[in-house]
Amino acid sequence: MNKNLIITILLPFLGTTLGSACVFIMRNELKVNTRKILAGFAAGVMVAASIWSLLIPAIEQSEKMGKLSFIPAFAGFWIGTLFLLLLDKVVPHTHIDSTDEGPSTTLKKTTKLVLAVTLHNIPEGMAVGVVCAGWLRNNGAINMLGALALSIGIAIQNFPEGAIVSMPLKSEGMSKKKAFVMGTLSGVVEPVAAVITVLAAGVLIPVLPYLLSFAAGAMLYVVVDELIPEMTEGSDHSNMGTIFFAVGFTLMMVLDVALG
């Protein structure tokens, strides 16, 4: 692996690690309004990344199909969505709002919370992996800066995600060090998923458009299933989640256009 590839793959994990370290500098549990802001920002980044870094390149790479160039993006998107839906049903986990999902289990609540975030980090790792694969294969629609832009965007949105995991664990009585470790571990799956996807894409170059849209479908599933409900939680109406959705969306858009 070359240096740029390693940096691109590890940046999102660094974002999660730094976010998890908030347990050492923040005293209290995250307020509802703060969680709305963080969830909205993360959702905005993921939606923009799904469109500019994944779906549009998937369609561009299929342009030889003419009017049917939408088919790989359409099919991959649905497969990615259904894949995350399946994982949600078969893996026991607890959402940030303490709602349990998946089969009954004796696992601790903290373990199921980390499982939930780990589960939803898989498509982010795949997204980084598939754009890196496109860059390494000298794909015209994706270059090194485009892959780096996606990686930076996901790293930025992983910072609040790391805090969203570690802070509630600390507030439930877990030591700061253990809460930090658990938050960090939730992000380990991202570089692992990225490396696996890079290797798989090397064998499956003809289906790269399907892999790009697969990652997009999986990421947008997470946005709708997890982040949008969180940015609108509570009985008091607030537009903060929506405003920071726009902030995250435009930031990722600028990153992709400026660097890609």
How would you describe each model-predicted region?
Residues 1-260:
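Intrinsically disordered, metal-sensing/regulatory segments
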